[in-house]
Amino acid sequence: MAKCFITGKKKSFGNTRSHAMNASRRDWKANLQKVRILVDGKPKRVWVSARALKSGKVKRV
């Protein structure tokens, strides 16, 4: 998946552990939403994290 246009958030990697502590590789995806925002005065559709939207770092068009 893409990364956040504002914060640069992207998916992170690690292990999931079973009860027996066996490791399996997995990834955690950031909560990204595709929104239209103004970039250089023009509307553009970009991936933005939900946290950036909630905190008001982005103004939707």
Swiss-Prot record:
Family matches, as InterPro entries: Bacterial_rp_bL28, Ribosomal_bL28, Ribosomal_bL28/bL31-like_sf, Ribosomal_bL28_bact-type, Ribosomal_bL28_sf
Keyword Secreted among record annotations: no
Name any Gene Ontology BP term.
translation
Pfam families found in the cross-reference section: Ribosomal_L28
Give the highest taxon in the source lineage.
Answer: Bacteria
Recall the GO molecular function terms of this protein's record.
Answer: structural constituent of ribosome
User: Which keywords has UniProt assigned to this entry?
Assistant: Ribonucleoprotein, Ribosomal protein
Mind naming one GO cellular-component term on file for this protein? ribosome
What family is it from?
Belongs to the bacterial ribosomal protein bL28 family.
Do you know which PANTHER family this protein is assigned to? 50S RIBOSOMAL PROTEIN L28, LARGE RIBOSOMAL SUBUNIT PROTEIN BL28A
Q: What is this protein called?
A: Large ribosomal subunit protein bL28
The species is Geobacillus stearothermophilus (Bacillus stearothermophilus)
Gene, per the UniProt record: rpmB
